[in-house]
């Protein structure tokens, strides 16, 4: 059964070369992952992409880092990749992700560290990069809330403190959304509400 098909035709012109100025902003919840992208090798080299070894969830970095160097794009509305979700041992399974939360946190922090605030990005690209950072941070916080232990809340507070210290301006941008505020909440009611939103979103979008 097909749970989710990722399409970008509402934002990207199809079957033609275009720039970010020709694109429309992707709405929240619509993000690109590794299976959606094919990069030119020269662009990958220029970006200096280095993925941490023996770490899951680095596909976020594969998308995020080189994308900042992209100028022209070509979108094909074709299913290049299909991914089965539902096995208990999958890296995106909720329980597995919580058990590997340190790796998710590491990737989250590397995303912030690799965001080039000093560069002038086209508006659509900048919005996407900020949204990608936001959704990754929300996922990290939501999983830590689901973990439910004191150590999970300590890790969440440490993550948010590290992100804020790394880039205060961007942190402010990714923490002003209502869902972000709930996921990042330090109080118990906020964490309970975060768990409820996570469950509803999980059923609606069909992830893990």
Give residue spans per PLM region.
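Short, charged, amphipathic alpha-helical segments
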Residues: 125-131, 153-157
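Catalytic core of nucleotide-sugar-dependent glycosyltransferases
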Residues: 78-87, 93-120, 139, 146-168
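Amphipathic alpha-helical repeat scaffolds of TPR domains
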Residues: 128-143
